[in-house]
Amino acid sequence: MFTYEEEQRIQELCTMAFDYARKNDLQNLKIMIEAGLSANLKNHKGDSLLMLASYHNSYDCAKFLLENGANVDEKNDKGQTPLAGVCFKGYLPMCKLLVEYGANIDENNGLGMTPFTFAVMFGRTDVVEFLSQNSKKSFLKKISLFLLKIFKRNKN
């Protein structure tokens, strides 16, 4: 058991780690992970360090976390994966990184939404194109290419 003061200090350190992940402060996040903090640490909303790094486009921190065992498909309390957040935001390099580390392109959030769905909904055509090229589902490839043509036609 920890004392109240120890619990408070642990909470402060965890909050600092989440801030480092958001702000791409690799130097300080690295110190904490190397000192024993879990690369899969989650906050009160179920967001992992990787979720926050990915969502805030903190590429260096995301890569470091993945290299140190972060679960690439860890869902938050809303059922979202880091890849879903990245597809919503439209961060193609981050999307590529997560897929390189095995992110499931077709992961369902429990409401029928996938990372691909978010990319399509928010018009992230470069992300849609990348995901369609990397999906194992032939139907997804066909429909995504069709949707890409529509998006490109509507932009012109």
Regions found by a protein language model. Name each.
Residues 12-31:
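Alpha-helical segment of the N-proximal tetratricopeptide repeat
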Residues 1-16, 101, 120-156:
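Ankyrin-repeat-protein effector appendages
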Residues 19-24, 52-58, 85-91, 118-124:
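Ankyrin repeat A-helix N-terminal signature
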Residues 25-33, 58-66, 91-99, 124-132:
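Ankyrin repeat structural motif
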